[in-house]
Amino acid sequence: MKLCMTLLITAIAVVTFVVATQEESAEFNEVEESREDNCIAEDYGKCTWGGTKCCRGRPCRCSMIGTNCECTPRLIMEGLSFA
């Protein structure tokens, strides 16, 4: 009887943990998707320093006075398919 109760409690704990983990994962994915929606996707697209970011972690490069900013490709990482 004690063994059955222990197994039942363990099963409930495992199911609760799995459900909580899936909910957190879904929330994290929604946040990541919303971040990707607010970024510049194309290479050499216009970005703003401290404002609209480039997607996939690409840098936003600006002129010396902080104007004429554009997203530049990450050649090493994208060329090797790491990003």
UniProtKB/Swiss-Prot annotation:
CDD domains found in the cross-reference section: Spider_toxin (cd12960)
GO function term, MF aspect, one: toxin activity
Primary location recorded for the protein, binned into one broad class: secreted
Modification D-serine (Ser) occurs at: S81
SS bond partners: C39-C55, C47-C60, C54-C71, C62-C69
Signal peptide: 1-20
GO cellular component: extracellular region; host cell presynaptic membrane
This protein's record includes keyword Transmembrane: no
Top-rank lineage group of the source organism: Eukaryota
Transmembrane portions of the chain: none
Pfam families tied to this protein: Toxin_9
Keyword vocabulary terms for this entry: Calcium channel impairing toxin, D-amino acid, Disulfide bond, Ion channel impairing toxin, Knottin, Neurotoxin, Presynaptic neurotoxin, Secreted, Signal, Toxin, Voltage-gated calcium channel impairing toxin
Positions of the propeptide segment: 21-35
Post-translational modification: The toxin with D-Ser (named omega-aga IVC) is 80-90 fold more potent than that with L-Ser (omega-aga IVB) against Cav2.1/CACNA1A (P-type) channels in rat cerebellar Purkinje neurons and is more resistant to proteases. The epimerization is done by the venom peptide isomerase heterodimer.
Tissue note: Expressed by the venom gland.
Family annotation (InterPro entries): Spidertoxin
Record has Cytoplasm as a keyword: no
Function of the protein: Antagonist of voltage-gated Cav2.1/CACNA1A (P-type) calcium channels. Paralyzes insect by blocking neuromuscular transmission.
Domain commentary: The presence of a 'disulfide through disulfide knot' structurally defines this protein as a knottin.
Similarity remark: Belongs to the neurotoxin 02 (plectoxin) family. 03 (omega-agtx) subfamily.
Name this polypeptide is given: Omega-agatoxin-Aa4b
Organism field: Agelenopsis aperta
